[in-house]
Amino acid sequence: MGSNDLINEAYDDSEVVGEERESKSAWMKRWYQLLTSPLDLQLVINEKLEMINWDAYAKSLAKPLGNFLTILFFIIRLLQDNLIKPNYYKLNVKSGAFDLSKSNKLKEFDYLWEISSSFQNSNQFYAFQSWYFVTLRFLNNLFRFTIFILLSLNLYVSCKFMFGYFKTYNLFHLKKEFNSPNLTKHNLKDLSKEYYEDIYKQSLWSMLKHFFRGSRDDGPHVNQNEVEIFFQLRKWIPTNFMINLFVSFSPTAIVFLSFSDVSFTSAIAIVFHQYILDYIITKRFQRSVDDDLILSSAALQEYEDKHIMVRINQCSNIDTLSSAMGTRSKTPRIFTTHSLCGEEIREVYNYEKREFEALPKMTESVPGSRETRIKDYGGISQVSDNQSHPIGFHYSPRMSPYYRDKVLDNNLAQSSSNENLEKGGAFLPNQDQNRPSKSLSPLRKTPLSARQKRFEGSEFNVLNKNDINSILRSPKKKKNYHKR
């Protein structure tokens, strides 16, 4: 049993040793990849940073971080002006400037050597030998390095905030040129060229190749008659995280602390400056931008709700084109709103004035439905004098009397023409004698013999008989023979 336990323990130790070797080999591979391909590590870090939603940490991270850096800069400048500056001479004096023990001339004379040694032993305080000044010298170097780091960080944040957040928009439908330094005119041919921003993102060889070779205009040809101008807007859009970091770690406070003698009373000015800047930019200007966004969204939603559309869609419009009644009347949409008192207000859009007008209460009538219109126009409608009219030549009682009288006159004229045709003895070959003619042409209303006599007595009698017969027997022919 003891030998088996020893074997199991040896086996377990071998597994632990194997895991340690694997971990060491994995670390070696990672260090090798880090040293051989640092750009891959940079790419991974950039991807991780871009995936973070920094605007969500604007209040919890950016503002406290900026305030901490400002307070740190204030404390360092306070220590420099009140601790390092009074001892500046003692900290910067050279330790070996008056060391008499290193003089070869004094060593030649014994009495001078004794005097110099006694003088140095009596002076027990030297700036370069004291622990206090050694500590101050170290703090002075540390403060200088920290000030340099904070100034560089503040310069980076300021430049990134003011020049690093721009987006370019190409406006092809803008006609009016506004007075803005960010709005510029460009030619449409510029779209076919490579942008310099894309060139800068390429490799060094591609950049050199482009600048030495020159740009080539390989884009499509633009018609000179067309408008070749478009506007380009370069809009400044900083992130919320960068706005809070810039306000809390502002360059104005850093410049003030750098070029002034800092004391404890300077803290009052710094606190007042931080509060005013945060109140103006964050609580006023940024909220004003958010309010403008709310108004734009509300206006867009109102336009979508009140958008004037046709009362029928395209499919139903196509279906009703072949019917006898034609398409339905397109009446403007009536918008119903309510006043502050609860009264119902109906408005209609006026295209000439480009504004909504309130409808009076007497005219607030919505057109009838499709079923009621079909009932009004269906079958044969009865009008005055007990006369009936077929579909397509009548109007419902809702129509105006003017159109009703017009229809009656047309029907009387049609009936009289039918009687004249029945009295005449000649009809065209392609015309049915049992039903009245549908055409209202004068050529169809008169008999063939009367038309021939009238034509022979006119100025066209110089034509031969065949031409006359062809003209009379083909009234639908568009080209007529005239005397030349």
From Swiss-Prot:
Domain of life: Eukaryota
Subunit structure: Interacts with CSM1.
Keywords: Membrane, Nucleus, Phosphoprotein, Transmembrane, Transmembrane helix
Subcellular location: Nucleus membrane
Protein name from the UniProt record: Nuclear rim protein 1
Residue positions, PTM Phosphoserine: S3, S417, S474
Transmembrane segments: 145-165, 252-272
Residue span of region Disordered: 416-457
Function: Member of a perinuclear network that controls recombination at multiple loci to maintain genome stability. Required for rDNA repeat stability.
Principal subcellular localisation of the protein: nucleus
